[in-house]
Amino acid sequence: MSQRRRARHAARPRIPIVLAAAIFVAAVGALVAWRLELWPAPSQDAVAAPPPSVTIPSPTAAPTTSAPPTPTAAPSPEPANTAFDGITTFRGNQTRTYYGSGPVPMHPRVIWRYPAQGSLCSTSTDQHGEREWCGTGWTGQPNVIVGRRGKIEVRTNAYDGAYHFLNGKTGEPVRPALQTGDLAKGSATSDPDGFPLYYAGSRDNLFRVIALDRPEPTVLWDLNAETSVPNPVWNDDWDGAPLVVGDYLLEGGENSWFYVIRLHRGYDDRGMVTVRPKVVLTVPGFDDELLAVLPDSNVSIENSVAFRDGIVYFANSGGLVQGWDISRVLSGGSRAERVFRFWTGEDTDASVVIDQSGFLYVASELERFTARAREVGQLMKLDPRHPNDPLVWSFAIPELGAEGAGGVWATPALYGRMIYVATNHGDLIGLERRTGEERWRIHLAGPTWSSPVPIDDVLLQGDCGGTMHAFDISEPLREPPELWSLSLGSCIESTPSVLEDMIWVGTRGGGVYGIADRKG
């Protein structure tokens, strides 16, 4: 089994679906002046008004599919955060299409490694016994926060069981690490509205809301994957990076459930950030139809949820892609409706990506080798406005790589007329987004689980030989020439963050690297 798979705890048996929802209590504390220089002041509208209420029916235990609402104005592939510069979540925004900003270094060198000595490692026990884990994992992408006077903070998960907070220019810690009880597997999310809050999960069952305006990171609230739903399935990790939409947090767990949490962010009379979280909706990532066709109960949600026009999209390890209209919940109600269902036939851990026209791009693995996977391929473009026949095009990725599996772990990247995808076999493939036609492919040292990062006509791709590659994609239909490559000495399975002429990325060797242009 793959390293990612070995991180799982023992699987749980199948269980019936239970859909739970609760009514929220509206209250938001007044904002006060910001205290820490590293962060900019929060925006005046940091606590956004929820969207207007719409009338939608309650979900059923085995929800049916109906037509989604007509999309509104297309979202922009800009960052979720507007009060400050940075990358606050995996792929930067609600549609998972913001990659950072350039310029990209053209003569790169490693200017720091964290830790300077040793590695970010710890032991963890699963069904195969106790073993050592190192690095920042296949889901890891650093948050990068630009504060006052150009200060940059890099926040990253690590397999030493901690979340780390580093000076982006030097790699020195800027605040104490937050230690958890097991692997800190997933990408976390920094509050995009300027509140000094950090939302992060761990393999110790807990998803945490953390205050960053104290002398050290302080857990204000946590959510237990084992006890927060009546019937958790499969596992208790938190791999995905949550989204903050208004005063609500959206997150999927490896316990196979999706959550909407009202945060009630505010400040106390001392000016310290406060939250009063309440789970207002839980939705199963599975249904009876899916469980009936699977040989196992592996239906965990390992991707970072995407959101557009009041609808949240996510997939699971059983290959079920769902869209839930949660606009009523985000307006203070308690009802949601499933408006989209599609089965890929295979484990789908890459995040769903949404383009400006509302199309979905979904990448799946190839491990079960089902007839459905042969039918729809491993890379799909879907139109949720046609829920009964959403498949626009599909592309097969049958080439096998690590552990005898094919398909895709990395999240695809949209850029201009192209979609870029990195495969378990080690291929980096460029396809036309409109037609799904392959235009070129380049073979790298697989498996390539690091997600592609296109910025300013430069495509960054890490490989498992430990090399970061930069390709010139200014002429998208041709095979891109390599601009440079840089060895980091160990498999790059995490996704890099790029901002202000720097790159930050972690490796399986246990280090986090700051990369910048050579001087002189």
Located regions from the model:
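Extracytoplasmic/lumenal domain signature
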Residues: 63, 67-85, 90, 97-136, ...
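N-terminal low-complexity, Pro/Thr-rich disordered segments
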Residues: 39-79
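Residue-level detector of alpha-helical hydrophobic segments embedded in or interacting with membranes
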Residues: 8-11, 35, 52, 58, ...
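Hydrophobic membrane-insertion alpha-helices, especially the h-region
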Residues: 19-31
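Juxtamembrane cytosolic interface motif at the C-terminal end of transmembrane helices
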Residues: 30-38
